[in-house]
């Protein structure tokens, strides 16, 4: 297995490392990996074609794959809650259709929640996550987005967004306890992920993962090559570039938000050339997955978004 760039110095033996670098300038030896000559591959999440409040059948996954291929994307990230079926025949049909169109199924976006004082609820979400890993493996998808979950004290998601993603813990509990639950729960999933060959990507997605510091607290506590970061450019509402830079070395998949027509909850003016420079400096070579979250029709907004990302992430 190729060692992750952030773990090289940590796991290399001191003698072997010093011997291997003898006669080499340290600044050259410790350079991050560079991106491929053609730049990062650009994919699209099926979320980009799916309306928030519409029925799943509005955009079946196979139609998203076909439309993504027609638009010129390299791959597709599948949103689980958009799938019409979890039957194996359906999974293999999606895999076959992607192969026919020359498309990678490169990401699987799932939901779970571990911020719950009830151990039985947390275990139920652990088993759910393991099941989702099995689905990703069956489709040959190499990485899966996971969440910490949240306290739920904000009520609806709209209320959470009005509070800029910030919510207090349940009465009688603390965020520190919540982190302990999340670390224990996700930590119990990584061996299954390793067995199935699916790298988990913890997203900066509200809850205890709202900040880069929160995500890093979990990643570093578990310390597994099978738990990395799914980095969402649109989920840092304060100091976005500083926080993106903190998580860039851990990133296995980047989700890139665009907001043509205005966002549903907010609109961010993201500087993608700057973001691409941050990711290049960290040695990120993985997929950039478009998540279009605006009110404009995907038929026009998604191709425009692809052009922006191609331009920014080309070598």
Regions found by a protein language model. Give the residues of each.
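Active-site acidic/histidine proton-transfer and metal-coordination neighborhood
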Residues: 13, 20-23, 97-107, 115-228
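Histidine-acidic metal/acid-base catalytic patches
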Residues: 2-43, 48-71, 187, 195, ...
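Glycine-rich, proline-tolerant flexible connector loops at the mouths of alpha/beta enzymes
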Residues: 77-95, 151-155
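Conserved beta-strand positions in the central sheet of alpha/beta enzyme cores
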Residues: 77, 107-109, 145, 201, ...
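Metal-dependent catalytic neighborhoods of phosphoester/phosphodiester hydrolases
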Residues: 86-92, 119-122, 299-301
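Residue-level detector of anion-binding/catalytic polar loops
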Residues: 74-75, 104, 142, 199, ...
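Short catalytic-loop micro-motif centered on adjacent basic/acidic residues
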Residues: 77-81, 200-204, 230-232, 289-291
